């Protein structure tokens, strides 16, 4: 049987890892224009660049709404089930965004991202506090590093390596050309 110290360290590493995934919504600030360009060229020609800018605030707002729901689910069903739900919703988000070029369908994916963020964010923090009751601030800080570190890692990868490696400029209408915008998928 692993000791409490080993369980605490494993729980902290798991919480940090989950927040490395959940922090991906901050990356939308970087890729909004690419996403709008993708929709413009593929299925939603009348979309405006500004239409994509509601995504990140919406995900954050839904996350805040689902923080308390996630804690209630954790209290009733446990942290594993809560994190399973969080992982399931983020998986559904990625699948919807990968296989749909319809803006209205993608909105469901963004809703799922907010739900995932809300369910997973506080439940792992609360779980780690059981192992570190005298260091709650320290533990919370380590876990939340993952949230911010996600965009710190993903933004340059998305912008400079995957989507627009040559750093081409937008066309006169504000959108990127079809070759660049299709790199988002």
Q: For each of these PLM feature ranges, what is it?
A:
Residues 7-30, 111-112:
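Pair of pore-lining "gating" transmembrane helices in MFS-fold secondary transporters
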Residues 54-61, 111, 141-149:
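Transmembrane alpha-helical cores of Major Facilitator Superfamily
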Residues 68-69, 123, 140-175:
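A gly/Pro-rich, aromatic-decorated transmembrane alpha-helix motif that marks the paired
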Residues 93, 104-120:
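Hydrophobic core of transmembrane alpha-helices in multi-pass small-molecule transporters
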Residues 35, 117-140:
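Intracellular juxtamembrane helix-capping segments at the cytosolic ends
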Residues 65-103:
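Conserved MFS/SLC helix-loop-helix module at the cytosolic interface between two early adjacent transmembrane helices
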Residues 23-26, 114-122, 148, 152:
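Small-residue-rich segments within alpha-helical transmembrane domains of MFS-like 12-TM solute carriers
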Residues 7-8, 27-65:
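Extracellular/periplasmic helix-loop-helix junction of adjacent transmembrane segments
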